[in-house]
Regions:
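Short acidic low-complexity segments
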Residues: 25-33
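A short, hydrophobic beta-strand-centered structural micro-motif
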Residues: 34-43
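Charged, amphipathic alpha-helical segments and their flanking helix caps
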Residues: 1-23, 42-125
Length: 125
């Protein structure tokens, strides 16, 4: 398995442990018929040094309405699931560390969005 696919598999697996029933996870862009609550993640390779691939993992969590408790709880769960997490698979070792968590203001005021970014270090095994 290539390293990017292996990393994406790890990310989807971790998100799957915290996403509520009926919520979806997308890579790069959500589908038009997405559910009310969903997450979109992206991976950007930012460095390669001595066999260590450094990625920035960005996870955007979306909800709709005026009550922010659901999206804040989900962002808390994602942060807990990823921060300082070590995942070892047959192909890669992956380490996650939180960099930033912030609210993103959307033009549509009924949209609620939280962005979490993680420094992600991948080693091929």
């Amino acid at each position: 398995m290539n390293k990017t696919l292996a990393l994406r598999t790890v990310v989807v697996s971790l998100l799957g442990t915290v996403m509520p029933d009926g919520a979806k996870t997308y890579y790069q862009q959500a589908q038009k018929d997405h559910p009310k609550i969903y997450a979109v993640y992206t991976l950007d390779l930012i460095d390669l040094t001595d066999g260590r691939y450094t990625y920035e993992l960005e996870i955007n969590v979306m909800d709709y309405g005026t009550d922010t408790s659901t999206i804040e709880d989900l962002a808390d769960s994602i942060q807990k699931a990823f921060d300082k997490k070590v995942q070892l698979t047959e192909d890669v070792g992956v380490y996650f560390y939180i960099d930033r968590r912030n609210t993103v203001e959307e033009e549509d005021r009924s949209s609620l969005r939280r962005r979490l970014t993680f420094s992600t270090y991948l080693y091929e095994r």
